[in-house]
Amino acid sequence: MFSITYVSLVKRAPGDRRGPRRFWSKIMKLAIRSAGAPPWRRVHNLLAVAATVFATTALPAQVVFHVSLGQASPTSVSGRLLVFAKPLGPADKRPVAAVNMDQIDTHATAIAAQEVAHLKPGATVELDADVTAFPTPFSHLKPGHYAVQAVLDRDHSYNYTGRGPGDLVSGVVEMDLPGDTAQLLTLATAIPEADPLQPLSNVPAALKEVYATAKADIHPIDFTSPALSRFWGRPVALRGWVVTPPDYAAHPGQRYPTVYYTQGFGGSLRSLHDVAVARWDEMKTGKAPSMIWVGVDQSSPTGTSEFVNSVNNGPWGQALTAELIPDLERQYRMDAKPSGRLLTGHSSGGWAVLWLQVTYPKLFGGAWPTSPDPSDFRDFLGINLYAPNANVYRKPDGTPWPLARDKGEMLVAVEDYSRREVVVGEYGGQYASFEWVFSPRGAGGLPVPMFDRTTGTVDPAVIAYWKEHYDVAELLRRHWPELKRDLDGKIHLTVGSADTFYLDGSAHLLEATMKGLGARTDFRYVEGRGHFDLYTMGDDLWGLYKAIAWEMYALARPGSKSPPVSAPPPPAPAR
């Protein structure tokens, strides 16, 4: 009773001392009433006092941050306010430039969040770091010295892009947590727009030197889609880059095979440009054949579109195949026939090109997906979504489902990744992105969640919808007779046998399905490779990309000869 009373008293406004005084007054009155009481009553009362004192010392202090809008914006702003806190040790470098979440180590940085509406310049908002936080309420953080930074995610894109243009950030403040939150966090800096023509920081120095030379052959795509614009009620554009070969201008009568590629989750228009420069340089140096490469950005505020005609994201497949491709074939000297329309992509981009090949088999001549997202939902990142009482957080034995691994060891659990995603924002994260593509639309206009974010329990009705519409293996089983003529032999899939996100499991199931249908299959499992080192062949970090390019060219130009390059990995034995 006393601990409950104490909790209710200390939740008064800061500076209100009536609660503690009233509390200790009650303790004293209880002690006085105990005088002269029977021994058992005195013991009972003293135990109650001891329990109350224990409660007062055990309860952690509430952590509230004060965040103000400085000179970063002359007008009021809204968005998702995020506060990041990372523990600092004696060996950590000072000063700390920025505090961000770690994509793999979910517990490396604590995050608290809340929505902010119409915050005016000079105004201050309080963020209670115990209400919406990961991995724990801030009052339960391990006591220590922390680097803290506030970010206002104005377009709610942090789950996908991290901090980006237009977001407002504070300086990094060092403080002791939990408890020491007296220092004001001021949103003083606006992140500027990034130049998509400038290389990202992780681009090799040798490739950066190529940018100026390649510029003339890399052309921006900014195509307003009628179909997507009708769906959203506002102009929506497909963006990307067309890479013409270095010899394009010198051969005005020549047509070229065309490769359509897209990025994985987290990719952007800017990262696609880096890929465009790399492809141009490979053609310039003779390491890859002369083809037109079209990089189409599939990122959106909700995640990746996967070029699916989705009830939530809109008709992205239609926009690409019926609108953009015909427009590009009018502008550039492309083959404009199935054998000259080829597809490749990695991870979520791999799933997208696999889907496009299966859905539009007459339009495209072949797809080379690498490490595609799950194509058979009986193995969705290792989890059978169709199993009775399926749960994405816990296995039947109660142990956590892993999301990522390295050398057989779990790097991050699905539950941790999902819970953090919810704190950072409502959409744009990986699991929310899957739902915006695959799920039915709910009564409130948002996708119906595939699983309960609190318990991890899978919704069988939602999974039934996923199976009916987007399980590639299931679609092949149902429609192979009508697909066989235009699709057979066109899928060339490569994945590491130790894929970081367990995507090799789904690939094995898809291959087994296709073999069971009598389809010609080309599945390759690179022994020991994960998600991020799959393309390395010998000393060449992009060797697999070049090998795939020559395979595509051989399909488009039968009889052509490729230079001596390392052969793509052979198919692994069936398991």
What function would you assign to each model-found segment?
Residues 30-47:
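Bacterial N-terminal signal peptides that target proteins for export
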Residues 45-57:
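Bacterial N-terminal signal peptides
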Residues 60-61:
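Boundary at the C-terminal end of the N-terminal hydrophobic targeting segment
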Residues 69-75:
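Structural motif
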Residues 75-86:
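Short, ordered, surface-exposed loop/turn motifs in non-cytosolic proteins
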Residues 87-575:
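Non-catalytic cap/lid and distal C-terminal segments of serine-dependent acyl enzymes
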